[in-house]
């Protein structure tokens, strides 16, 4: 796991609404999302960081080898980069972003375990 992926502080943590990666708000703005930046373009765009991440999430998992872990398969992060992931993320991506993802062939499934989609 790359050190820059690990949250640098326990305050101002946010989780990506698409992949559930957890970072500080500044890390998302500076580096974007390691898994989703090709689609969400959060890097350098604080407004997109607020739209595409949530400060409300439950549990965290540090994933070192996502391809080898049954937990990563259960959490649907086995194809993502090593990092810290939320178990459940409250919220949904804005409809415009969901439509854009669909037009690019990316299926969006909410990471909020309270909502069944």
Curated annotation (Swiss-Prot):
Summarize where Zn(2+) binds, as residue positions. Answer: 16, 19, 33, 36
Q: Which GO terms describe its biological process?
A: regulation of DNA-templated transcription; transcription elongation-coupled chromatin remodeling
Presence of keyword Nucleus? yes
| GO CC, alphabetical | DSIF complex
| InterPro entries the UniProt entry points to | RPABC4/Spt4, Spt4, Spt4/RpoE2_Znf, Spt4_sf
**Which UniProt keyword terms apply here?**
Acetylation, Activator, Metal-binding, Nucleus, Repressor, Transcription, Transcription regulation, Ubl conjugation, Zinc, Zinc-finger
N-acetylalanine: modified positions: 2
Q: Assign the protein's first listed, main location to one coarse class.
A: nucleus
SUPFAM superfamilies tied to this protein: RNA polymerase subunits
* Pfam families attached to this UniProt entry: Spt4
Outline the residue ranges of the record's C4-type zinc fingers: 16-36
Q: How is it modified after translation?
A: Ubiquitinated by UBR5 when not assembled in the DSIF complex, leading to its degradation: UBR5 recognizes and binds a degron that is not accessible when SUPT4H1 is part of the DSIF complex.
One annotated GO molecular function is: zinc ion binding
| Localization terms from the record | Nucleus
Stretches the record annotates as Interaction with SUPT5H: 2-40
Q: Which domain of life is it from?
A: Eukaryota
Q: Does the keyword Transcription apply?
A: yes
So what does this one do? Component of the DRB sensitivity-inducing factor complex (DSIF complex), which regulates mRNA processing and transcription elongation by RNA polymerase II. DSIF positively regulates mRNA capping by stimulating the mRNA guanylyltransferase activity of RNGTT/CAP1A. DSIF also acts cooperatively with the negative elongation factor complex (NELF complex) to enhance transcriptional pausing at sites proximal to the promoter. Transcriptional pausing may facilitate the assembly of an elongation competent RNA polymerase II complex.
Question: Which family is this sequence assigned to?
Answer: Belongs to the SPT4 family.
Quaternary structure, per UniProt, is: Interacts with SUPT5H to form DSIF. DSIF interacts with the positive transcription elongation factor b complex (P-TEFb complex), which is composed of CDK9 and cyclin-T (CCNT1 or CCNT2). DSIF interacts with RNA polymerase II, and this interaction is reduced by phosphorylation of the C-terminal domain (CTD) of POLR2A by P-TEFb. DSIF also interacts with the NELF complex, which is composed of NELFA, NELFB, NELFD and NELFE, and this interaction occurs following prior binding of DSIF to RNA polymerase II.
Entry protein name: Transcription elongation factor SPT4
Instruction: Tell me the organism's taxonomic lineage.
Output: Eukaryota, Metazoa, Chordata, Craniata, Vertebrata
The gene for this chain is SUPT4H1
């Amino acid at each position: 796991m790359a050190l820059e992926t690990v949250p640098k502080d326990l305050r101002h943590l946010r989780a990506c609404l698409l992949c559930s990666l957890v970072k500080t708000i500044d890390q998302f703005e500076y580096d974007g999302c390691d898994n989703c930046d090709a689609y969400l373009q959060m890097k350098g765009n604080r407004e997109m960081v607020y739209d595409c991440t949530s400060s409300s999430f439950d549990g965290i998992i540090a994933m070192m080898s996502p391809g080898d872990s049954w937990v990563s398969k259960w959490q649907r992060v086995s194809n993502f980069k090593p990092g810290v992931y939320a178990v459940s993320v409250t919220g949904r991506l804005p409809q415009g972003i969901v439509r854009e993802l669909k037009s690019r062939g990316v299926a969006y499934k909410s990471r909020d375990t309270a909502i069944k989609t």
